[in-house]
Amino acid sequence: MADKHLNSMMENLYWWGIPTLFRCPNEEAKNQDIALVGVPHSTGNGTTERDQHLGPRALRNVSSVGRRMHNEFQLNPWEAAKIVDVGDVPFPRANDNEDCIEQITRFFGKLDKSGTRPVSIGGDHSITGGIVQALGCGEITKGEPVCLLHLDAHTDVFTKVDHFLGAKKSAAHW
């Protein structure tokens, strides 16, 4: 928009525009510090009847009304770093868990080559393996261990089985 006043008003309307995490720009990862990535995947559970694939969209909707500055710490992450929402990992074969894990690994491999650090929003637990595989041998880590912050109510880790409902790379184990 050419009118700066109108553009400023529209940016404050959380229901307007492309829904992104915390209303950050929807841009490519190149020359950015952090890329927010949606990973809308549920088939690591052997079914899409569970709704983990709806997580990225739901979080984008909820985060759009939140404040972009932490009042207690007086921290505005968008001033401290260049943060963008690069959208979702595409899953043309969304019901094929093995293919989805390959798509995740490819997507995060390309993201790693851009030099941008990812923050991913899933999806079921099976997304973790593909992400760690891509980043563990990537440019950013240069062979160093990958740091993983996994926020969940439970781990769903099973070490005594080689599959979960037929999925070899599943939400249950890697």
Residues covered by each model-derived region:
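Conserved alpha-helical scaffold segments that buttress catalytic/binding sites
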Residues: 2-174
